[in-house]
């Protein structure tokens, strides 16, 4: 009887995790555009990635956060879909989301990346995958 009860609890807990999207896969985040944490992650990812691109002279910047999905692992994966454009800030300067605005004539690209934040708060950015402008 005790083992049956434990099995029911285990299966019930797994069903809740699967239904809420906590168990394994990515979950889309609602109200992502109103959440400053996601905007800060988007700017962090975009500035970090663009600074590592050979031949670039200017940072890219975030024009829009299109979609945010999260996955809980040993930390959190944030899969970000962004519209990015070349900014007015040169790579020799310090990136600032408030002053590094898109150039007026810059093409906007839709890009996807994953930012992993471990349990200590350290972040890493996967390469961007962008659609042609």
Curated annotation (Swiss-Prot):
Tissue expr: Detected in saliva (at protein level). Detected in salivary gland and midgut.
Domain Cystatin: 30-118
Signal peptide boundaries: 1-19
Disulfide bonds: 89-100, 111-130
One GO cellular component term: extracellular region
Deletion phenotype: Combined, RNAi-mediated down-regulation of salivary cystatin-L and salivary cystatin-L2 in salivary glands strongly impairs the tick's ability to feed on hosts. About 40% of the ticks cannot feed and die. The remainder show much reduced blood intake, appear unhealthy and display strongly reduced egg laying. RNAi-treated ticks show an impaired ability to suppress the host's immune response to tick salivary proteins.
MF annotations from Gene Ontology: cysteine-type endopeptidase inhibitor activity
Site residues by UniProt (Reactive site): 24
InterPro entries on file: Cystatin_dom (IPR000010), Cystatin_sf (IPR046350), Prot_inh_cystat_CS (IPR018073)
Main function: Contributes to the suppression of the host's immune response to tick salivary proteins and is important for successful feeding on hosts. Inhibitor of cysteine proteinases. Inhibits host papain and cathepsin L (CTSL) (in vitro). Inhibits host cathepsin S (CTSS) (in vitro). Inhibits host CTSV and CTSC, but to a lesser degree (in vitro). Inhibits host immune responses via its inhibition of host cathepsins. Inhibits differentiation of host dendritic cells. Inhibits proliferation of host T-cells in response to antigen stimulus.
Description of how the protein assembles with itself and partners: Monomer. Can form homodimers in vitro, but probably not in vivo. Homodimers are predicted to be inactive; dimerization disrupts the interaction with target proteases.
Protein name listed in UniProt: Salivary cystatin-L
Organism expressing this protein natively: Ixodes scapularis (Black-legged tick)
């Amino acid at each position: 009887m005790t083992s049956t009860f434990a099995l029911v609890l285990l299966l019930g807990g797994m069903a809740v995790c699967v239904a809420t999207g906590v168990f394994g896969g990515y979950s889309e985040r609602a109200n992502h555009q109103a959440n400053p944490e996601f905007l800060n992650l988007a700017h962090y990812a975009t500035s970090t990635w663009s600074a590592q691109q050979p031949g670039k002279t200017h940072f890219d910047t975030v024009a829009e956060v299109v979609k945010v999905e999260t996955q809980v692992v040993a930390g959190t994966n944030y899969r970000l879909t962004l519209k990015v454009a070349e900014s007015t800030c040169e790579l020799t300067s310090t990136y600032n989301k408030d002053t590094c605005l898109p150039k007026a004539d810059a093409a906007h690209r839709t890009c996807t990346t994953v930012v992993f934040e471990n349990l200590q708060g350290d972040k890493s950015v996967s390469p961007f995958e962008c659609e042609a402008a």
